[in-house]
């Protein structure tokens, strides 16, 4: 029996050995009603700020999301938590997404790139236009080859919603979040109604939070990458799931370079927790999946891939992206070549510091690794020469996942922040 009177399911402790996830968690995580109400008010404040300060499609999202968050915060004390969360997700994601899909226009330029890349992949074996056809910034494809999969339905002739990349981006994101969060429930969701409600609530909150909801509504390509990263972290709560975690992370790395930092951090964690063999297995699996997806495209036209995925994001091509941000690194890069070099130098120094700290004080659990990753990515996106505020969906999403999956009673073995990592003797 658990502390709240619930019987622990028989499969909580498999014959192969104890789980790393605490078996006797209560159904309700620590993130209870009081914290949830506060979170919705914070979400509402963010959405109101977007209405006042942003422009374009972001304002359309905020016009739907702000009242949804306010109503959720007011209704939560008298309503079922999971029902409020689901309705909030519908009005914060689905409603503005449908409005923007019906509106169309230039805001969907990223989807045009994905659709074109899928058609090129089928026709030429590469999703990238050759240098002679790169006539404007929109001709470039900064995504890695796996991102083209979201354009394949349109490339094979599907019309309407089934062929729209935006629909598939949302579906993959929600599926990835659901899979990651389902691994943290204490019992089987098929037999435990309490776990089903908790899981549904967590999925809805994760989808409705502004970091994810805004990016889903305006359809950026980051949420599915984040979802796969979270899935890899959740899978590694069990040492028996190294291969599935490696596959999930390898696919994420083949979509965008924003997932690359996850590999060394998780390798350091596995080396400390499970030994060198497990770390090598995970690293080899992730890299093998990444190479299996990207290497054929690289061999088909290496120059085109380098121009699109390396030179264009670094601002080293004739046509520059019109997107801008006010991050310190981007502001430095705009001052000229010296500022650009300084930004790159700061980024390299940050990377070296992270590498040294990983060797000296490796994270001891997936939760600690998630803190490492959130802090590392936040520093990279702050100091990088060509970063966007939208990239902060990664550190914010990681912190949100940590909040939603934190057990009601922390076990000392579940890890913590990077400061709680265990030092390794020199």
Language-model regions, residue ranges each:
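Primarily membrane-embedded glycan-assembly and transfer machineries that use lipid-linked glycans
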Residues: 2-233, 270-392, 402-405
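Hydrophobic alpha-helical elements and their junctions with loops/disorder across both membrane
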Residues: 124-125, 239, 253
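Hydrophobic/aromatic side chains embedded in well-ordered alpha-helices
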Residues: 203, 216, 244, 250-251
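The feature captures the transmembrane alpha-helix scaffold of multi-pass secondary transporters
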Residues: 228, 243-247, 263, 375
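Membrane-interface junctions at the ends of membrane-embedded or membrane-associated helices
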Residues: 236-245, 269-278, 403-426
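Transmembrane helices and adjacent periplasmic/lumenal helix-loop junctions
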Residues: 247-271, 292, 385-391
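Composition- and surface-driven signal marking solvent-exposed, interaction-prone regions
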Residues: 393-396, 411
